[in-house]
Amino acid sequence: SAGQDNEAVVQNVIDKAIEEFGRIDAVVNNAQASASGVTIADHTMDQFNLAIYSGLYATYLYMQKAYPHLKETKGSVVNFASGAGLFGNYGQCSYAAAKEGIRGLTRVAANEWGKDGINVNIVCPLAWTAALENFQDAYPEAFKANVHMPPAGHYGDVEKEIGRVVVQLCGPDFKYMNGETVTLEGGMGQRP
């Protein structure tokens, strides 16, 4: 819940983490606000900025401010993106734009930071969360157009099916994996 786009706030979070734990081994950027469900024609600049600032800019700042510490520990970064960007989901223009920006930023960081022993990857999850339930209630048309039961027959479990993969991506067994997008959508995220 430290998703901020203010440099001073982000630096304070990083400083507090160092003060508390003495090091940073991993950064996981997974929080973002957006006006999902609002079409491009009806989107306002404030709605668009909400997604870009809370998603793309916050991810950039946390990566940048944590970099010196990640370099020391040869740490890992996992950034969350979305099928909304991969597939151009209806009514999710600002969310998709922010998430695809995060994917681009992640690939650049993988190229720039690989020499420092830092691996940077992307997870695109589909899990039943309070946010997805709120999206269903607030924008039923967009929900119906975009969210379908995965071939796995259930939505992902946040802790078991998403969280465990994130932990592995931050661990020593996956250090060679760098700049990759992992879709955890129960078969919905199949790509060529």
Protein language model regions, located:
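Catalytic Tyr-x(3-8)-Lys segment
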Residues: 140-160
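Substrate-binding pocket helix/loop in short-chain dehydrogenase/reductase
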Residues: 38-40, 44-49, 143-146
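Residue(s) in the substrate-gating loop at a strand-loop-helix junction
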Residues: 82
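Short C-terminal tail/terminal secondary-structure segment
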Residues: 37, 87, 166-167, 178-192
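Short, small/polar-rich loop/turn modules that mediate ligand/substrate recognition or access, typified
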Residues: 114, 119, 177-179
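Active-site helix of classical SDR
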Residues: 63, 98, 106
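Active-site loop-to-helix junction immediately N-terminal to the catalytic Tyr of the SDR YXXXK motif
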Residues: 43, 88-96, 108
